[in-house]
Amino acid sequence: MRITSTYRTYAQINNNRPAIVTDKEIVPYSEWYDLVQRTAASFYKVTGIYKRVALFLPNGRLFLQLFAGASEAGWASMVGDMRWKEQEIEERLQQITPDLIIADEKMKGYFHQSSTKTIFSDEIEEWLCSSSDFQKNDGNAPFYIGFTSGSTGKPKAFIRSHSSWIESFRCNQIDLEMTEKEHVLIPGSFINSTFLYGALSTLFLGGTIYVLTKFSPARLMDFLHNYPISKVYVVPTIIQGLLNEGYYNEQSVSFISTGAKWLPSVKAKMRLQFPTANFYEFYGSSELSFVTVLKNNEQIQHAASVGRVFQNVEISIRNDKGEEVGLGEEGVLYVKSKMLFDGYLNNEEETKKILQGDWATVYDIAKIDEEGYVYILGRQNDMIIYGGMNIYPQEIEQVLMKYDGVEEAIVLGIKDEYWGEKVAAFIKGNVSLPSLKNYCLRNLSSYKIPRVWRKVANFPHTTGGKISRPEVRKWFEKGGLE
């Protein structure tokens, strides 16, 4: 089975029901099914199945059409960020070695001399097949390639199977209480897998998605006022944007949130401005998928928790010896489910660190109480979640250490009401911080640029000679680095 397998049924029984609504068009299921089939045939025509495509496109129907069409044809799609710098693009393309690149016409200046076959958005209509004849695949092939990072700070490509996401779709139905009648607003970029998943899961279940081509609080509220929205996928930046504008809404809508955990002050403000709304927070990762969910009626009494496990997930919390710990005791969180990723592309060594038999771990430190509520106490990999985007300190640290005069550098995530977390850089060396920031602007995506900069005379170190992240964090929180 494929993530696109249900489209034909909806085209037959709900042919006039909108599948996708944007500020520019409405696409009913009958048209959506036809577009996906013709697009799949176009991919198949290139070189058959089990190939890879890199997509560099803005939010909209065309992106979803190409992603779904590639999935239907047995291809795997890498979702590229149009904000990536040249080096970031090259690193990722070298890893996945795509058979085809499809990019926005605004990127012709970059891709026009690419050795990989490239199609631009203004050429799609000519490329698209008029018929939908192609060999159907069985859904066992990977369909999605994303990027995460490990201790080296270098991006690693991870792969997802159709079956893992289809199993996740069951969580939407059972744990998030979603039906085929949903009207789901997708306000964020498909670069973030939260929003891509939100769109594709809704289409699989037969609902209608409303896609913002570009986010703004005003546009989100316009869609809430003008359409029968029942669910909204959000990350902390979107929530804070709504709060900053002071919007008030009494619609019965549910907000589904991932990313950095909401601060209690943010939750309180949301309940004042959206008094009849429901809130769902879920915890997971690129490798693990869904792990826990904190439902609306649990938000106050268990505010510090990430919730209880989804109905199709098992967890185990273990000490350094691999032994399961007792209730309330800290340990490394292990997860068992059918939603786990397939592994890292061409990186068996790193895959084995995550996938361990039937279990998997990203080395988050957790504990569980007697009622089954899970608490995440820290991340062994120190990942920062900035506005729903995953940022890995090691990647930024590597850039900082290449700058002349930098002797030592460390990057941390610090709590922020708007972003959830923001990036802070601590530098030892005879350098100009404005010059160092300009250097980062030339070598990192804009969202990875540190928002807080501090120079340090000396760092605290561990016995192994590494900078002690916990001690630096304590210094900062006590105002010792101001």
List each language-model region with its residue ranges.
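Conserved ATP/PPi-binding loop(s) of AMP-dependent carboxylate-activating enzymes
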Residues: 308-312, 323-354, 389-391
